[in-house]
């Protein structure tokens, strides 16, 4: 083991340090005592004798200030620090926050449990350039002397930027007489104004900087890019104002620009200080300028040009005329008359062919240079090509087809810069290996021939100089008569080889597509005109010789704009983010890249006349105030990208009329059209041969373009002949397709599976949805969708097709691939917060169960929350038999209709077969509201059930076909299969009407009131079915008149206080008192009542164990339902624990025990408020 990483043999002490206000914290005048003080304050070990010794040392070194230790004590006698734990005098303090004091390690250890939540690292002290006047403290000897107490600043220094400085007023057309002090090129140079006021101001601020920072000592400061700091110049070691341009944290250096002198350099971080607020905020003295009206001929200023201009104007006093003000006043476009030449600088640049006027297009290279290179290469090729094999039939193979959004693992094969990367798919490694073997065999059987002279642009086999292996290569040019420049099309690199190292290639070897994928990192750009060598080296270190996850975000100039992530790193980070954070690149919008037209391919599409008017358009929007809207999904690409439209009859009618006008416009439009990326147009959809509004996404080759139909969201590639220009009148209606993504979920395995897509499509496609906006990002609207009363995200989570966003996936506790006999038992005790949440239900594999032809189809079991309940069909009022009460949003009644006895008997038989073949039950933790199989304690048989509550060891269930409840151990719970849920439960899930006004968490008083109301005679009226629950209106029968329970509950919610009814029967009042006495229990009162009946619990409606299903007939006779009576007795006492009323609400809590404690605290607070209010 490396001793540098060896663990210490002794456990380190908690962070304690001596307080700065103690007797030994006075900062001495000499340098040596400061060192001793720092060691003392940083000490983590409490040693009494050692501290005393150090006190003596400090006293001796501070002899010029303190006459004796007693003097120091008397001086600081006014400051007393108390231990944060025991309140005794504490002379030690936490080294982390440097604020909390303690008297010993023992007290600090006891207080650490609470203190760690507020203990934050202290901010390094910054020495102020102007110390505050300190209060004079008399000496103990009474001589009248004073001792100033130094005040240290713990506050974070304020960062200062250019915007915080005063603006220099320079008007357009004004003349400035100045001297050029620094010149990089004609597009960037600095001048100093020649005036006495500027010279005096510059001298003054320079003196302020030297006075503030020359003698200061501070810790290393980490500036931000764009911040103004005080920087020590390397040549004269003086301090000047500078702007931070880049920060290299690894090398502890930063690139700075001296704003008062115009030059720049790289300095160490310890030579940088935060700029004090006391430094005058005068504008930069160096005015940044550029020569107006010109730009470089070849796209960048050449070295020859810079030298000529430097000799012409550098260090000379000239009169500059301000022709334009750019970059919010930070850059002045100027020109000056050079007296020695008799012409302006701009004219000189144009005359010397260094620059051209701004309105002339720039060419990256002159036509003469390009022509010379092509001519030389062609002459070298044709010189000895007469009658030889030019390999003209071997054309380059097609490139690999990649689409935006594709993601794959790749290996970088060649890299020149972040804008020029070539990589190979890792999944094609075996194909490439086989290709290399075929090339080796082919070339070994093909002899070299003097007759073979391939033409530029053709493909052949080339022997690579480094490993002497054969590869497919494209002939780029002839550098001489017998040497050729080739590019290896499967790897991206190129080299110059001799002609005798080339071989002709067969058609079979050209069948495979080009394996090198040209890429560029999306979203970043170089800090200068070109990428620096340091940036390229860092990128090679990050991506070369390792597996990289590549995702295609767009396309530009024939390259894929990608993001790259090294999945082997910990933590995983984007290469783009790393380059930006390390100061090697700047952020650039990806959308800008996508919207730029490809000049190489746009010319292949017929040109149209330039558009005279500037088109303007808008897109449909969704409210972001929590309002639910009706949506219809029109295009589904994935759960992270789908398009929908806000369903409105008015907009639908308008869209129909606009489509008719669009059709007439396209039939009459005859002018050719040139597609431009990011511009709208009319496109013909080949699916139905109709015209629609579209947006150009990409200009492809062969006269085609890729468009997105803006009212529906789908995209396709169309011919240029099927594109028409659009008019402004057809753009008045906002684009109807709204890009959305499903919020709150993410893929289980990193990518969305096909099953999740199909399930999402089944829930949402082609039907109205209820949606609410949760967030807005660059991906569109993050939506919460409801389909048929179900939250789509909750359904996907409960079916194990998605997981909550940001949740760390726990390893499965039961391996599905193992036989049932090999499943290990879970521990007998398991904290509730380790249970699988509603998003990840447990699944049990049943592959190990023996099957016979008459057995059920075996499928994996789970604890589904979205089990389907019966939909009532009652036309009038009826008297419900309440089985269990959770809240007004969720309660269960027995099926008031006829029971299908034969179907129920078959289900019971299937349940018995399924459960008998399961392994020894594990202590699974289903969530409240989930369906399951439960073993009845009366006869040890298995029945279908619904979980009401769960603790660490037990579950409170209701038997879904009989209505009685009991508490069973978790070992008596098994998952249930989808086949066993086909037959509907005999308990019916219900809710009061008006659910949209109900809260997520119900007040305890309202739950108590609702339980009391249901304890008497109740009549119900069916109002509808929302896809999840039957909506009922309940009426309480009370002698003279009926009372609407729905109105009572809504009124109680609105008033916020509960007034008990004076007409309640006496037994109800007693039950209410009994409820108040039982509020201290951590479980519901329903459960408490059932525990009193646990000794006399009957099995689920079974009178004879030999006939397990015969008692099902008792559902037809209400008077014989003893279990219903038990249920009614239980429901007369309401739940004191707020149950989760939907699967979506359950996702927000992962610890039931903590939730119960919080509910209990809320009850006590409400009780206290009521008592105070009554007084």
From Swiss-Prot:
Alphabetized UniProt keyword annotations: Cytoplasm, Developmental protein, Differentiation, Meiosis, Metal-binding, Repeat, RNA-mediated gene silencing, Zinc, Zinc-finger
GO cellular component, one term: P granule
Annotated Zn(2+) 2 binding sites: 94, 97, 115, 119
Alphabetical list of Pfam families matching this protein: TUDOR, zf-MYND
Biased composition (Basic and acidic residues): 1115-1128
Any one GO BP annotation for this protein: spermatogenesis
Binding sites annotated in the UniProt record for Zn(2+) 1: 83, 86, 103, 107
ZnF (MYND-type) ranges: 83-119
Compositionally biased spans, kind Polar residues: 1078-1089
SMART domains attached to this UniProt entry: TUDOR
Start and end residues of each Tudor domain: 222-282, 453-512, 674-733, 925-983
Compartment annotation: Cytoplasm
Region (Disordered): 1-32, 827-852, 1060-1089, 1115-1136
Record carries keyword Zinc-finger: yes
Keyword Repeat: yes
Family matches, as PROSITE patterns: TUDOR (PS50304), ZF_MYND_1 (PS01360), ZF_MYND_2 (PS50865)
GO molecular function: piRNA binding; zinc ion binding
Skewed-composition ranges (Low complexity): 8-19
Organism domain of life: Eukaryota
Function statement: Plays a central role during spermatogenesis by participating in the repression transposable elements and preventing their mobilization, which is essential for the germline integrity. Acts via the piRNA metabolic process, which mediates the repression of transposable elements during meiosis by forming complexes composed of piRNAs and Piwi proteins and governs the methylation and subsequent repression of transposons. Required for the localization of Piwi proteins to the meiotic nuage.
UniProt family annotation: Belongs to the TDRD1 family.
PANTHER family: TUDOR DOMAIN CONTAINING PROTEIN (PTHR22948), TUDOR DOMAIN-CONTAINING PROTEIN (PTHR22948:SF72)
Protein name: Tudor domain-containing protein 1
């Amino acid at each position: 083991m490396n001793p540098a990483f060896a663990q210490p043999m002794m456990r380190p002490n908690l962070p304690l340090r001596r307080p700065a206000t103690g007797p030994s914290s006075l900062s001495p005048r000499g340098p040596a005592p400061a060192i001793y003080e720092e060691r003392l304050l940083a000490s983590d070990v409490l040693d009494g004798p050692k501290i005393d010794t150090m006190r003596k040392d400090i006293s001796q070194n501070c002899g010029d200030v303190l006459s004796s230790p007693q003097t120091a004590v008397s001086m600081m006698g006014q400051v007393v620090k108390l231990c944060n734990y025991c309140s005794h005098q504490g002379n030690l303090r936490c080294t982390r926050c440097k604020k909390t004091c303690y008297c010993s390690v023992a007290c600090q250890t006891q207080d650490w449990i609470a203190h760690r939540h507020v203990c934050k690292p202290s901010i390094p002290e910054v020495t102020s350039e102007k110390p505050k006047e300190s209060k004079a403290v008399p000496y103990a000897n009474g001589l009248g002397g004073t001792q100033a107490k130094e005040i240290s600043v713990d506050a974070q220094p304020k960062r200062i930027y250019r915007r915080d400085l005063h603006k220099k007023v320079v008007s357009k057309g004004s003349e400035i007489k100045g001297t050029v002090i620094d010149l990089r090129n004609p597009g960037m140079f600095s001048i100093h104004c020649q005036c006495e006021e500027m010279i005096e101001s510059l001298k003054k601020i320079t003196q302020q900087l030297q006075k503030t920072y020359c003698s200061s000592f501070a810790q290393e400061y980490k500036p931000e890019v764009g911040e103004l700091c005080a920087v020590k110049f390397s040549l004269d070691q003086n301090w000047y104002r500078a702007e931070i341009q880049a920060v290299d944290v690894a090398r502890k250096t930063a690139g700075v620009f001296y704003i008062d002198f115009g030059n720049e350099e790289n300095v160490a971080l310890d030579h940088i200080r935060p700029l004090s607020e006391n430094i005058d905020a005068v504008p930069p003295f160096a005015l940044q300028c550029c020569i107006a009206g010109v730009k470089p001929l070849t796209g960048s200023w050449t070295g020859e040009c810079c030298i000529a201009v430097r000799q012409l104007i550098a260090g000379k006093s000239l009169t500059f005329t301000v022709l334009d003000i750019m970059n919010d006043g930070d850059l002045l476009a100027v020109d000056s008359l050079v007296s020695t030449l008799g012409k302006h600088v701009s004219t000189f640049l144009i005359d010397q062919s260094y620059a051209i006027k701004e309105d002339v297009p720039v060419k990256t290279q002159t036509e003469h240079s390009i022509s010379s290179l092509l001519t030389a290469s062609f002459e070298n090729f044709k010189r000895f090509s007469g009658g030889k094999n030019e390999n003209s039939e071997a054309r380059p193979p097609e490139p690999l087809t990649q689409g935006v959004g594709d993601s794959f693992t790749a290996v970088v094969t060649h890299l020149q810069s972040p804008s020029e990367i070539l990589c190979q798919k890792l999944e094609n490694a075996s194909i490439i290996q086989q290709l290399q073997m075929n090339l080796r065999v082919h070339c070994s059987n093909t002899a070299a021939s003097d007759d073979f002279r391939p033409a530029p642009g053709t493909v052949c086999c080339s022997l690579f100089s480094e490993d002497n292996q054969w590869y497919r290569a494209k002939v780029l040019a002839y550098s001489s008569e017998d040497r050729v420049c080739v590019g290896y099309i499967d790897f991206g690199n190129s080299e110059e080889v001799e002609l005798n190292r080339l071989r002709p290639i067969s058609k079979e070897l050209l069948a495979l597509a080009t394996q090198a994928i040209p890429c560029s990192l999306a979203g970043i750009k170089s800090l200068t005109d070109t990428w620096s060598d340091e940036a390229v080296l860092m990128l090679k270190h990050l991506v070369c010789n390792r597996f990289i996850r590549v995702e295609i975000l767009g396309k530009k100039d024939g390259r894929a704009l990608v993001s790259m992530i090294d999945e082997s790193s910990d933590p995983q980070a984007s290469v783009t983010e790393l380059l930006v954070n390390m100061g090697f690149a700047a952020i650039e919008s990806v959308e800008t890249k996508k919207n730029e037209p490809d000049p190489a391919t746009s010319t292949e599409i017929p040109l149209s006349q330039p558009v005279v008017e500037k088109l303007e358009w808008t897109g449909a929007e969704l409210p972001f105030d929590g309002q639910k809207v009706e949506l219809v999904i029109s295009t589904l690409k994935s759960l992270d990208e789908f398009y929908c439209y806000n369903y409105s009859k008015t907009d639908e009618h308008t869209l129909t009329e606009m489509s008719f006008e669009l059709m007439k416009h396209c039939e009459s439009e005859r002018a050719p059209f040139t597609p431009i990326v990011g511009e709208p147009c009319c496109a013909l959809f080949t699916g139905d041969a109709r015209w629609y509004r579209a947006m150009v996404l990409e200009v492809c080759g062969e006269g085609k373009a890729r468009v997105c139909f803006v009212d529906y969201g789908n995209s396709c590639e169309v011919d240029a002949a099927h594109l028409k220009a659009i008019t402004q009148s057809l753009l008045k209606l906002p684009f109807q397709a709204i890009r959305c993504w499903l919020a709150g979920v993410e893929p289980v395995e990193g990518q969305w599976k096909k099953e999740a897509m199909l399930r999402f499509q089944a829930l949402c496609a082609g039907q109205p949805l209820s949606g609410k906006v949760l967030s807005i990002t660059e991906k569109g609207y993050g939506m919460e969708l409801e389909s048929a009363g179900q939250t789509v995200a909750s359904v996907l989570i409960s079916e194990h097709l998605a997981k909550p966003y940001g949740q760390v996936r726990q390893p499965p506790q039961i391996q599905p691939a193992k036989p049932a006999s090999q499943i290990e038992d879970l521990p007998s005790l398991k904290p509730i917060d380790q249970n699988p949440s509603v998003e990840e239900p447990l699944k049990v594999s049943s592959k190990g169960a023996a099957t016979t032809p008459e057995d059920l189809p075996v499928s994996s079991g789970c604890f589904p929350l979205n089990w389907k309940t019966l939909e009532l069909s009652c036309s009038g009022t009826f008297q419900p038999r309440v089985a269990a009460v959770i809240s007004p949003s969720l309660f269960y009644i027995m099926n008031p209709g006829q029971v299908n006895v034969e179907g129920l008997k078959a289900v019971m038989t299937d349940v018995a077969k399924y459960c008998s073949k399961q392994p020894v039950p594990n202590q699974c933790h289903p969530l409240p509201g989930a369906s399951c199989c439960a073993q009845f304690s009366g006869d040890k048989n298995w029945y279908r059930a619904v979980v009401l509550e769960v603790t660490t060891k037990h579950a409170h269930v209701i038997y879904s076909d009989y209505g009685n409840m009991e508490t069973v151990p978790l070992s008596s719970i098994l998952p249930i299969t989808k086949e066993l849920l086909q037959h509907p439960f005999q308990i019916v899930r219900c809710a009061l009407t008006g659910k949209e006004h109900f809260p997520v968490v119900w007040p305890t008083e309202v739950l108590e009131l609702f339980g009391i109301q249901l304890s008497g005679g109740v009549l119900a009226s069916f109002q509808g079915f929302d896809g999840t629950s039957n909506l009922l209106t309940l009426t309480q029968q009370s002698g003279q008149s009926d009372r609407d329970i729905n109105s009572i509950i809504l009124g109680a919610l609105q008033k916020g206080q509960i007034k008990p009814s004076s007409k309640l029967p006496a037994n109800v009042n007693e039950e209410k008192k009994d409820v108040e006495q039982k509020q201290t229990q951590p479980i519901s009162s329903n459960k408490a009542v059932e525990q009193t009946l646990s000794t006399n619990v009957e099995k689920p409606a079974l009178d004879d164990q030999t006939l397990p299903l015969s008692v099902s007939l008792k559902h037809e006779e209400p008077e014989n339902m003893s279990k219903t009576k038990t249920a009614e007795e239980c429901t007369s006492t309401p739940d004191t624990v707020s149950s989760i009323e939907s699967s979506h609400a359950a996702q927000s809590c992962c610890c039931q025990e903590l939730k119960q404690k919080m509910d209990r605290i809320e009850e006590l607070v409400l009780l206290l408020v009521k008592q105070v209010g009554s007084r």
